[in-house]
Amino acid sequence: MNTRLACVFLFCLIAPLAAAEKPNIVVIMTDDQGWGDLSVNGNTNLSTPHLDSLARDGVSFERFYVSPVCSPTRAEFLTGRYHPRCGVHATSNGGERMNADEQTIADVFKTAGYATALFGKWHSGTQVPYHPNARGFEEFYGFCSGHWGDYYSPQLEHNGQPVKGEGFMIDDFTRRATDFMNRQKGTGKPFFLCLSYNSPHSPMQVPDQWWEKFANKEITL
């Protein structure tokens, strides 16, 4: 009985969406950022006004489950399933790879007629069939490994081809994502964009303006 009610409820939610115009969707993911790494959650050592605004004016999930490490969390986001079911059990030595037959959120949007793109960190496999271009993302600019040793103009890739990054990686990924959205404006095609930042993961490099802002700041507990 509960299953039937759940299905009816789901149908009532989905039916209006099917008839509505397809919205553009942007997902922004940060790396190794904890719940307490936001000023909106009481951290007085940081200043995160834009994220605070999203939390105050949008929807905030305050009771949720997420894996404490990288690749398992990414697998769960990409598939909507617990990471062991996807074949992901670690962050290296092949344990970061989702099963090749898993359907990703990008696959679903691509099938629905969306342009799909990922800019930034992947960490779910480096080669086909694990590469983002083989997992539903038509456009990929970034890196596939777990982290990068230098955040300034490093070696990256664009749709499988090696390229050199342009400046601070976070800014580079943001520019590329913005360019993608601007290109999509005149196409009449909706887009699904994942902007996957590698920060604040170590080595925790930042532009001088942000370093200088906090260089001599005392940490309060």
Regions found by a protein language model. Give the residues of each.
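Formylglycine-dependent sulfatase
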Residues: 2, 17-221
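Bacterial N-terminal signal peptides
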Residues: 6-16
